[in-house]
Amino acid sequence: MSKLDEMTAYLPPFLTKLKEMAELLKAEAPEFEKQNNSIFDLTDQLFVTTATWGLERWEKILNVPRESGDTDEIRRLRLISKMSNIPPATYRAIEHALNRFLKNPSAQVRLLPGEYRFKVDIDIDDMQHMSELIETLENMKPAHLAYTLRAALNEPLQIKDTVILNNRRYRKASELKVGYSVTLNNNEVVLV
């Protein structure tokens, strides 16, 4: 379907019968066709796989040198190769990057298998550059993983408590007699 036919289909039938409208559509249809082609060509430049005249900009962005005699296809393949060579983010790489912001390298990254997340523990005394730490984490972490950033204490905690366990067995109604206590057994254990 040509652009003229497409534009005519949008109009009510009584307008398409007017001579002035037909002439107007004949004059504007080629202009709209050129505009649509320009828009599609421009959007093609946003993606390496479809770019033509925009390959030069992609090469500049990714710092890929252009060699003489390269076809567009070779240039595309070189750009795609450069974009896919992003090193994987390992937990050690994340730890190393976070420790750059800390006075005492204390960052510990622990993966939680099967939960699609990881924990980052940082000494509470080293939490002065929080915005940089979070930005680094957001930039380095794989997109499919979540994380929990926790402040850790640099000294061990010792919790002391006493727990008393009572294991009581009560008599059934048929076992109750005058002078008997309600409890059959009363075992008490103290855990310290």
Curated annotation (Swiss-Prot):
It comes from Bacillus subtilis (strain 168). To B.subtilis XkdU. This is Uncharacterized protein YqcA.
